């Protein structure tokens, strides 16, 4: 797994080693692009506001396409009002979203399609439970 950070100040919840172990377990060898809130090219005013505030309203904090996972995390260089506990309780924190996207990667490897959200969610939760995170 190759890690690409936007500004270098973004911190991965649980640490980089945990993220690498999760990716290795799922067989992901692509790039993880890490963006701080308010950074990155997602269009739309509502999405930009969500990145600034950390409130996603049903949107995840990560995105998958074959060979690339984008993750949005709170960054010290961004002015983000970020409630980590609220996202953690809803399983919408960046680590849970990353595990969910790894579920899409596993789907893509088996079926060459990655659109089944229920399977990805289940795989992500099982992966986190296996590593003792949840």
Listing of model-derived features with the role each one plays in the protein:
Residues 43-92, 105:
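Active-site scaffold of zinc-dependent metalloenzymes
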Residues 91-96, 118:
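Alpha-helical scaffolds flanking conserved acidic
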Residues 113-134:
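Post-HExxH zinc-binding segment in Zn-dependent metallohydrolases
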Residues 32-44:
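A short acidic/basic microdomain associated with nuclease active sites
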Residues 12-31:
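Zn2+-dependent metallopeptidase catalytic core
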Residues 96-109:
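Active-site recognition of the HExxH zinc-binding catalytic motif
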Residues 2-13, 61, 90, 129-134:
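Long, well-structured alpha-helical subdomains associated
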């Amino acid at each position: 797994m190759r890690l690409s950070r936007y500004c270098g100040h973004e911190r991965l919840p649980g640490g980089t080693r945990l993220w690498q172990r999760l990716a290795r377990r799922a067989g992901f060898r692509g790039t993880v692009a890490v963006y701080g809130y308010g950074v990155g090219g997602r269009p739309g005013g509502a999405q930009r506001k969500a990145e600034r505030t950390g409130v996603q309203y049903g949107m995840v904090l990560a995105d998958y396409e074959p060979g690339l996972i984008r993750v949005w995390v709170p960054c010290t260089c961004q002015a983000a009002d970020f409630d980590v506990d609220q996202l953690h309780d809803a399983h919408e924190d960046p680590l849970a979203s990353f595990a969910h996207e790894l579920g899409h990667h596993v789907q893509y490897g088996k079926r060459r399609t990655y659109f089944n959200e229920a399977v990805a969610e289940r795989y992500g939760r099982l992966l986190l439970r296996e590593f003792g995170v949840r």
